[in-house]
Swiss-Prot record:
GO terms for cellular component: cell envelope Sec protein transport complex; cytosol; plasma membrane. Part of the Sec protein translocase complex. Interacts with the SecYEG preprotein conducting channel. Has a central role in coupling the hydrolysis of ATP to the transfer of proteins into and across the cell membrane, serving as an ATP-driven molecular motor driving the stepwise translocation of polypeptide chains across the membrane. ATP binds at Q88, G106, E107, G108, K109, T110, D506. May bind 1 zinc ion per subunit. Monomer and homodimer. Part of the essential Sec protein translocation apparatus which comprises SecA, SecYEG and auxiliary proteins SecDF-YajC and YidC. The lineage of its organism: Bacteria, Pseudomonadati, Campylobacterota, Epsilonproteobacteria, Campylobacterales. InterPro entries: Helicase_ATP-bd, Helicase_C-like, P-loop_NTPase, SEC_C_motif, SecA, SecA_DEAD, SecA_motor_DEAD, SecA_preprotein_X-link_dom. Belongs to the SecA family. It is an enzyme of class 7 (translocase). This is Protein translocase subunit SecA.
């Protein structure tokens, strides 16, 4: 109460921030008359003057902001016949300050972006504008290019349909580059698999504006971008696990110390499966194993867990669809089909086994990054969306981004009515149909929002029975999305849409529809996130238009059933609500919002937890990529690095074969054999007589240096350095891929450390650090072994880089789409070998430590 009184007197923090921006808007408005009297050439000359001041360092962007914004506004009037409103100037300043501008639907975010884009492009370092799909990227770039071109800037677009690096490089070399989050992220990963700097397509990560920032940085935060390759693992386990899962009985969750009945319990809140002791015993019997959770059966246990999830947590036409005998993911936030994406950790294979379609092979991660860590690389990050305040805490804690709500140019007239809640879904469905009939009878357009494809088709069938013409927009027919959404505001239109409801495409209405009350939004279920509900509401009432929104709920809806239905049910029972009757109350609406807050909090903690783990891998990724970039630099002294590695290798090998610390007793027979095998070099025991430990290490290093120099004498220095660089890169890349595989295994099992009263995150940091130290040593020593073992003639040496690039390109082409396409490159004779058995190659190592290592080898290591 006291806080509300303070806000009434002093305003909210947001109000105070907006007030500051309005002061600067007045200064920009004062300049408008100066620039509108100039000719085109004079206006361009004025802008060029400010640009030169930025490039010379005489002034910075903040110094020239008022003039540049005034010039961009004038340019918009001349080229597009569009003048930036005062609130749009505020939006532009918010973006320039590296914050999130929350602007309602129809407020012109596309035009707003031109202000900070132009201001930040003046430094020549490039500006990226990110949208959620190719259509919007292309549309926005084409529409706004008139402003950019007038002021002398080049504009590029990065599209998924572009096949060549040349097109992408041309787009990134432009002053301003539009594209999707996926393409920007994948290009970054692909760049860090290239063998020369000239082949890289991206420039530095200077300034980025993310459109629909909540969708990209919140909804997709848990979906990493993955470039994947094939593994040699068998798929039979998924078929067995699917059969076992079908025979296991679901039990009900109980509070400890009581033990649940049945073979497993479904934890819907955390979307997890808990197998009971009885379930473990049954699974062991059905699989024919003694201990399901022994090390040898770890993969089988994991496959069973995924099979149970596939049967109990994932529904067809809700979480995925079947198309052409393939399991296609339905994005839970947009309702779109996610072509080319696959669930990770074997879940997709479990769903394929469940649906009895061809099981595609598992993939091995070759390179990955989350959107969280990709966008945090930029020197300055900003975003725009119509719905951000509900996630302001997460934006602040994860991305250090403040959210500023920008006032609308014209006040919102939409009526947001309280929810109507029914006891059962059937009652709710009937009530929705009746409401549609009423609105349709007078010609008022209706947009019906559903949470899944399944629900949209339920309403479709009911409307067909009522003979009400309508359109259905869901993942199965998303190709017509823009056309359907554009017509949704016409007289008599009834449109059923999943959450995808055309973000970025405005629903416009005419005066006749305004007189009928505007577009009527009917939500048939509350989403887990208030933000998604607000997006649906925001389809109506754009730019001061009238409109209505209302949600119809039932106690059988997932959100209420899992997170808060008991309280509402007790209220309905006390009020004696009969079948077919509903309850409408602010208390009930608040109870629903509290349930949503619980879910949002759970998801936030989940994303935060994942980021804590990913930050560990991210630091390692940055270290490896930084070193990889050094290797690509022609001025990098690769020869000095090789000499250093030879010295470390020599010290390491010598220590391995010393029988005492004094160095007087060395196993020279085994040492000679190892050096001959790994470095193709003969050594004599006499060379090491009467030497100290340090002297022996130095002597071995000197012998290997001389041997290496003699071996490479026949090659020209330039060719030699190029060979060394390419081979070193291949060793680094293969070692990094193997490291990612080991990190995946570590992450999968680390949660079990909690049962031993240890913090899994602390354990993960410790173990991953040890793995990283092993990785560094593997790169050093494997590069030495490889450089000593290769044999080249002049022609092979000259073609090495081309061959490496060709192999890399093949690997990328088979696996760029978020782990989509996976080809088995494994040798047939290795497929059936148990992981702990001796490797058939004769190395003497266990298969899992030799040819059983996951992931494709590349280049000369293949």
């Amino acid at each position: 109460m006291f806080l509300n009184a303070l806000k009434a007197v002093f305003g909210t923090k947001n109000d105070r921030e907006v007030k500051k921006y309005f002061k600067r808007v007045a200064q920009i408005n004062a300049l408008e008359g100066n620039y509108q009297n100039l000719s085109d050439d004079e206006l361009k000359a004025e802008f060029a003057k400010f640009k030169e001041q930025i490039l010379s360092g005489e002034k910075n962007e903040n110094d020239v902001l008022n003039d540049v914004f005034a010039i961009v506004r004038e340019t918009g009037k001349r080229t597009l016949n569009m003048r930036h409103f005062d609130v749009q100037l505020i939006g532009g300043m918010v973006l320039h300050d590296g914050k999130i501008a929350e602007m309602k639907t129809g407020e012109g975010k596309t035009l707003v972006a031109t202000l900070p884009v132009v201001l930040n492009a003046m430094s020549g370092k490039g500006v990226h504008v990110v949208t959620v799909n190719d259509y919007l990227a292309k549309r926005d770039a084409e529409q706004m290019s008139a402003i950019y071109n007038f002021l002398g800037f080049s504009v590029g677009v990065v599209l998924s349909s572009q096949n060549s690096d040349i097109e992408h490089k041309q787009a990134y070399d432009c002053d301003i580059t539009y594209g999707t989050n996926n393409e920007f992220g994948f290009d970054y990963l692909r760049d860090n698999m290239k063998f020369s700097k000239a082949e890289k397509v991206q420039r530095e990560h200077n300034f980025v504006i993310v459109d629909e920032v909540d969708s990209i940085l919140i909804d997709e935060a848990r979906t990493p971008l993955i470039i994947s390759g094939p593994t040699n693992r068998t798929l039979d386990g998924y078929i067995k696990a699917n059969e076992v899962a079908k025979q296991m009985q679901k039990g009900e969750a109980v509070l400890p110390p009581a033990k649940p009945e049945g073979d497993f319990v479904v934890d819907e809140k955390n979307r997890n499966i808990l197998i009971t002791e009885a379930g473990i015993a049954k699974a062991e019997k059905l699989f024919g194993v003694e201990n399901l959770y022994s090390l040898d059966n770890a993969i089988l246990a994991h496959q069973l867990d995924q099979a149970l999830k596939a049967h109990n947590l994932f529904e067809k036409d809700v979480h995925y669809v079947l198309r052409n005998n393939e399991v296609i993911i339905v994005d839970e936030f947009t309702g779109r089909l996610s072509e080319g994406r696959r669930f990770s950790e074997g879940l997709h294979q479990a769903l394929e086994a469940k649906e009895n379609v061809k099981i595609q092979e598992e993939s091995q991660t070759l390179a990955d990054i989350t959107f969280q860590n990709y966008f945090r690389m930029y020197n300055k990050l900003a975003g725009m969306t119509g719905t951000a305040q509900t996630e302001a805490t997460e934006f602040s804690q994860i991305y250090s981004l403040d959210v500023i709500s920008i006032p609308t140019n014209i006040p919102i007239k939409r009526q947001d009515k309280d929810d109507l809640i029914y006891k059962t879904q059937n009652e709710k469905f009937k009530a929705v149909i009746e409401e549609i009939k009423k609105a349709n009878a007078k010609g008022q357009p209706v947009l019906v929002g559903t949470a899944s494809i399944e629900r949209s088709e339920v309403f479709h069938n009911m409307l067909v029975k009522e003979k009400i013409p309508h359109h259905v927009l869901n993942a199965k027919n998303h190709e017509q999305e823009a056309l359907i959404i554009q017509d949704a505001g016409k007289k008599g239109a009834v449109t059923i849409a999943t959450n995808m409801a055309g973000r970025g495409v405005d629903i416009k209405i005419d005066d006749e529809i305004r007189a009928l009350g505007g577009l009527y939004i009917i939500g048939t279920e509350r989403h887990e996130s208030r933000r998604i509900d607000n997006q649906l509401r925001g389809r109506a009432g754009r730019q001061g238009d009238p409109g209505i929104s209302r949600f119809y709920l039932s106690l059988e809806d997932n959100l209420l059933r899992i997170f808060g239905g008991d309280r509402i049910k007790s209220i309905m029972d006390r009020l004696g609500i009969e079948e077919g009757e509903s309850i409408e109350s602010r208390i009930v609406t608040r109870a629903v919002e509290n349930a949503q807050k619980k879910v949002e909090s759970l998801h936030f903690e989940s994303r935060k937890h994942l980021l804590e783990y990913d930050d560990v891998a991210n630091e390692q990724r940055k270290t490896i990529y930084r070193y990889r970039n050094e290797l690509l630099d022609e001025n990098y002294d690769i020869r000095a690095k090789i000499s250093q590695n030879i010295a470390e290798y020599s010290a390491n090998v010598m220590n391995d074969y010393m029988l005492d610390e004094s160095g007087s007793n060395v196993n020279f027979e085994n040492l000679k054999a190892k050096i001959l095998y790994e470095c193709s070099t003969q050594i004599s025991e006499k060379d090491f007589e009467n030497l100290s430990v340090i002297e022996m290490q130095d002597k071995l290093s000197q012998i290997l240096e001389n041997s290496y120099n003699e071996k490479m004498l026949r090659l020209e220095i330039k060719e030699l350095r190029n060979i060394e660089r390419i081979l070193y890169l291949q060793v680094l890349d293969n070692a990094w891929r193997e490291h990612l595989y080991q990190m995946d295994i570590l992450k999968t099992g680390i949660g079990l450390r909690g049962y031993n009263q240890k913090d899994p995150l602390v354990e993960y940091k410790k173990e991953s650090y040890n793995l990283f130290l092993e990785l560094v040593n593997r790169i050093k020593f494997d590069s030495i072994k490889l450089l000593f073992s290769v044999q080249f003639n002049q022609e092979e040496a000259q073609n090495l880089e081309n061959k490496a690039n060709e192999e890399n390109e093949k690997l990328l082409q088979s696996s760029v789409e978020m782990g989509a396409s996976e080809d088995n490159l494994g040798e047939a004779e290795f497929k059936k070998v148990p992981r702990n058995a001796p490797c058939p190659c004769g190395s003497g190592k266990k298969f899992k430590e030799c040819h059983g290592k996951s992931g494709p080898k590349q280049g000369i290591l293949a």
